[in-house]
Amino acid sequence: MAEKRRGSPCSMLSLKAHAFSVEALIGAEKQQQLQKKRRKLGAEEAAGAVDDGGCSRGGGAGEKGSSEGDEGAALPPPAGATSGPARSGADLERGAAGGCEDGFQQGASPLASPGGSPKGSPARSLARPGTPLPSPQAPRVDLQGAELWKRFHEIGTEMIITKAGRRMFPAMRVKISGLDPHQQYYIAMDIVPVDNKRYRYVYHSSKWMVAGNADSPVPPRVYIHPDSPASGETWMRQVISFDKLKLTNNELDDQGHIILHSMHKYQPRVHVIRKDCGDDLSPIKPVPSGEGVKAFSFPETVFTTVTAYQNQQITRLKIDRNPFAKGFRDSGRNRMGLEALVESYAFWRPSLRTLTFEDIPGIPKQGNASSSTLLQGTGNGVPATHPHLLSGSSCSSPAFHLGPNTSQLCSLAPADYSACARSGLTLNRYSTSLAETYNRLTNQAGETFAPPRTPSYVGVSSSTSVNMSMGGTDGDTFSCPQTSLSMQISGMSPQLQYIMPSPSSNAFATNQTHQGSYNTFRLHSPCALYGYNFSTSPKLAASPEKIVSSQGSFLGSSPSGTMTDRQMLPPVEGVHLLSSGGQQSFFDSRTLGSLTLSSSQVSAHMV
């Protein structure tokens, strides 16, 4: 049916009549005009595409607008742009120019002409053949020390806050580019919450967990860099540091510190503010918003506020990397410890243990079964026995040994000495005054030594022992006519002689002159005497140096209050330590003074 109709003379006549109608004639003319306009705009767009892509987008928008305004077109225009009778070619050019201007504004180009008239197109085309003027760049901020921030962020950065304010570590340090060198800018920083949650640290999993909702908001604070305002050139040629910024949890703070809540997560922000837009900038007000304000933040700078570090890894990392935390580092890496310092001075410490009256009970009690007492009282209140002097473990070298001697010249009747397994190591007889002396030593402070009048030391050594004899006529203190004290020096095979033949030379002497006395140590090569140590209580003398004789004495002092000689005597054939003549006594009462004891610390060190 349709074919019949189409082939009918009526239908053919209607089509021919329509081709010569007024509407068809007007539409063809308009179509020709639009094609001319499109060719012209296409040429402009081709030239504008070299310099700015926004022009082509603007031209497309103008054509679209003109096609939308074309309502009376009889035939559909090809590829989308026909103009209606209500719009002229000038309007199309104006619309195209306006779209191109929008494109420049979007591209931040200063070359867009505000009028959008046809005369503006040649002006733009004249500017396009040359190099276009540089458009101002958008500000760019780069975080300095980003690697350190990332290390903290991987663990979970924590920042200490205190009432007085605490600086951040790592501190925010940035580098800014893209500013107008001649424009003035403010650089500021604020810290905003990441979310509205409160956190707690779970130690067994070493993670931060949500503990509830955030606390009430704190007063806003902004830290304005002290160098603000400054030109863009000044800001761009330096690293901008916010190391003086402090964090506090004191909501009543009036020092300008940033107020934060503990156990919350925060994000620092850096603001670049043009001076003309920073009139409302204040440390106690939020940062103003506007066209001249740019904010920058970095995800690795998120931190959790704490009053004490929760994660030990954060603590160690901050101690290692913070230059202000040197005091918390291991001192052994930087300086010698006290113990190492003391060890470098061997003479400060005794090389062997001190032999005291308290050590004597460690000597085993051997010998006759009838040996039950050491010292017998003399009726003056001294205890009859001192069993603690003879008991305990085996002998050690060096040590004092007690044993009987068949040639005793002075007995402590009826005391028996227990024999020691070692031969030649004997302490042959104290006089009965030894009990009094020992009792006097064990008494409280306030006791004084009663200096004997004529005791003397005579030491004669064998190949294995050094015998120090104490002789005299007075029995007050350490006095026996021919009592010998045998002490072994370990490994000392050569002879060691300490001779004081003069009867006037004494150990604890009054102000006596010693005439004709010959005092000497004789030490045969290759052995050497390291030193003796007679340990006394610090109360024995106000100054240990006073105990030492001014010339020729072999006694020294140590920091512990011990009278000791820690110097190695060279292995020479003869060493004169106590010279003849003068007042060279072993212990002189003029230097010793009134001696008081609180403990029985009279001992000897032998090496």
Swiss-Prot record:
Q: Assign the protein's first listed, main location to one coarse class.
A: nucleus
Cite a single Pfam family from the UniProt record: T-box
Cell location: Nucleus
The UniProt entry annotates the motif Nuclear localization signal at 36-40
Annotated spans, Disordered: 30-141
Please name the SUPFAM superfamilies in this protein's record: p53-like transcription factors (SSF49417)
List where Low complexity composition bias occurs: 44-53
Tell me the leader sequence span: none
Q: Which UniProt keywords apply?
A: Developmental protein, Disease variant, DNA-binding, Nucleus, Repressor, Transcription, Transcription regulation
Give the result of residue 524 to Y, as annotated: In CAKUT2; results in decreased transcriptional repression through a dominant negative effect; does not affect nuclear localization; no effect on DNA binding; no effect on interaction with SIX1; no effect on interaction with TLE3
Sequence motif Engrailed homology 1 repressor, location on chain:
18-28
A Gene Ontology cellular component where this protein is annotated is: nucleoplasm
Q: Which GO terms describe its biological process?
A: cell fate specification; cochlea morphogenesis; morphogenesis of embryonic epithelium; negative regulation of canonical Wnt signaling pathway; negative regulation of transcription by RNA polymerase II; neural plate anterior/posterior regionalization; positive regulation of DNA-templated transcription; regulation of SA node cell action potential
Explain the purpose of this protein: Acts as a transcriptional repressor involved in developmental processes of a variety of tissues and organs, including the heart and coronary vessels, the ureter and the vertebral column. Required for embryonic development of the sino atrial node (SAN) head area.
Subunit composition? Homodimer. Can form a heterodimer with TBX15. Interacts with GATA4 and NKX2-5. Interacts with PAX3. Interacts (via engrailed homology 1 repressor motif) with TLE3; this interaction represses TBX18 transcriptional activity. Interacts with SIX1.
Annotated disease? Congenital anomalies of kidney and urinary tract 2: A disorder encompassing a broad spectrum of renal and urinary tract malformations that include renal agenesis, kidney hypodysplasia, multicystic kidney dysplasia, duplex collecting system, posterior urethral valves and ureter abnormalities. Congenital anomalies of kidney and urinary tract are the commonest cause of chronic kidney disease in children.
- The protein's name: T-box transcription factor TBX18
Give the species this sequence originates from.
Homo sapiens (Human)
